[in-house]
Amino acid sequence: MSTVHEILCKLSLEGDHSTPPSAYGSVKAYTNFDAERDALNIETAIKTKGVDEVTIVNILTNRSNEQRQDIAFAYQRRTKKELASALKSALSGHLETVILGLLKTPAQYDASELKASMKGLGTDEDSLIEIICSRTNQELQEINRVYKEMYKTDLEKDIISDTSGDFRKLMVALAKGRRAEDGSVIDYELIDQDARDLYDAGVKRKGTDVPKWISIMTERSVCHLQKVFERYKSYSPYDMLESIKKEVKGDLENAFLNLVQCIQNKPLYFADRLYDSMKGKGTRDKVLIRIMVSRSEVDMLKIRSEFKRKYGKSLYYYIQQDTKGDYQKALLYLCGGDD
């Protein structure tokens, strides 16, 4: 395995263990922060005839998540009302969705998105897959804790009752957040063994040994798997993504593809999802909002750079073309600038 690959692997992981604001986030803590003043200004904005959305957007998209929690606390102390409820009544449409998302902690936001993906008839597998495949161990463990707190049931139980077959097994294994952490020692023998096992369990045989794929892809560290997928190419005529498309179908195929893309390059994975949410006619606002809200303090700067590199125009430009009004303003602030 080349040293270059090892360095790239290390670089791709920095800033990844990131519920705390990361160096690659577009939203930073506001320097002259005053929760009381912000709470008062938001209260005035809500009371203004027609609602002063601009002030609400300016404040909440330019504060860190921690600062927003302080504003919500100060607002409740001032008015004896919950800030989220007040804003829910004052705002509507996509802007409301963005602002209410920003008021939740990262784990509360993910937990509520997961719950919504499994509520009612049918499952929104796309959202379930995106969140479960892209979060770190630490993030998943916090999501599990908060999910139980919010909904009085286990995330795993809800996943089990809403999914089936191998797709269920994969989602349950990932949701536990028990993947090995990246170590300083590189085990080349195990890399080779895993690459061969993935090939033997899939492309090489008739039918697929899905449990073998699940165990390797949900238990090994991200850095280890990046090397495994490289090594895999020396055994298989197809790369890992092509092999998945040949071997499995439906939700399971979609989940494995998302997972491998996240492991290979998470910022690029999100750049692709953002592009897909805006290309062609109509916008898949739910996906667009979720990524802009959830990655703004994690790796938005990396996502922007991957987006520009792959699609030739900036993420900022695409958002400008695809959205309008104060909703657009909020997303552009979260994007953090043009490239």
UniProtKB/Swiss-Prot annotation:
The modification Phosphotyrosine is found at Y24, Y199. Pfam families: Annexin (PF00191). A pair of annexin repeats may form one binding site for calcium and phospholipid. The modification N6-acetyllysine is found at K49, K152, K227. Calcium-regulated membrane-binding protein whose affinity for calcium is greatly enhanced by anionic phospholipids. It binds two calcium ions with high affinity. May be involved in heat-stress response. Inhibits PCSK9-enhanced LDLR degradation, probably reduces PCSK9 protein levels via a translational mechanism but also competes with LDLR for binding with PCSK9. Binds to endosomes damaged by phagocytosis of particulate wear debris and participates in endosomal membrane stabilization, thereby limiting NLRP3 inflammasome activation. It may cross-link plasma membrane phospholipids with actin and the cytoskeleton and be involved with exocytosis. The lineage of its organism: Eukaryota, Metazoa, Chordata, Craniata, Vertebrata. Gene3D superfamilies: Annexin. SMART domains: ANX (SM00335). The modification N-acetylserine is found at S2. Belongs to the annexin family. Heterotetramer containing 2 light chains of S100A10/p11 and 2 heavy chains of ANXA2/p36. Interacts with ATP1B1. Interacts with DYSF. Interacts with COCH. Interacts (via repeat Annexin 1) with PCSK9 (via the C-terminal domain); the interaction inhibits the degradation of LDLR. Interacts with CEACAM1 (via the cytoplasmic domain); this interaction is regulated by phosphorylation of CEACAM1. Interacts with APPL2 and APPL1; targets APPL2 to endosomes and acting in parallel to RAB5A. Interacts with S100A4. May interact with UBAP2. Annexin repeats lie at residues 33-104, 105-176, 189-261, 265-336. This is Annexin A2. It is found in: Secreted, Extracellular space, Extracellular matrix, Basement membrane. There is a cross-link at K49 (Glycyl lysine isopeptide (Lys-Gly) (interchain with G-Cter in SUMO2)). One of its GO terms (molecular function) is phosphatidylserine binding. There is a cross-link at K49 (Glycyl lysine isopeptide (Lys-Gly) (interchain with G-Cter in SUMO1)). Residues 2-24 are annotated as: S100A10-binding site. Keywords: Acetylation, Annexin, Basement membrane, Calcium, Calcium/phospholipid-binding, Extracellular matrix, Isopeptide bond, Phosphoprotein, Repeat, Secreted, Ubl conjugation. PROSITE patterns: ANNEXIN_1, ANNEXIN_2. ISGylated. GO terms for cellular component: basement membrane; cytoplasm; endosome; exocytic vesicle; extracellular region; nucleus; plasma membrane; vesicle membrane. The modification Phosphoserine is found at S26, S184.
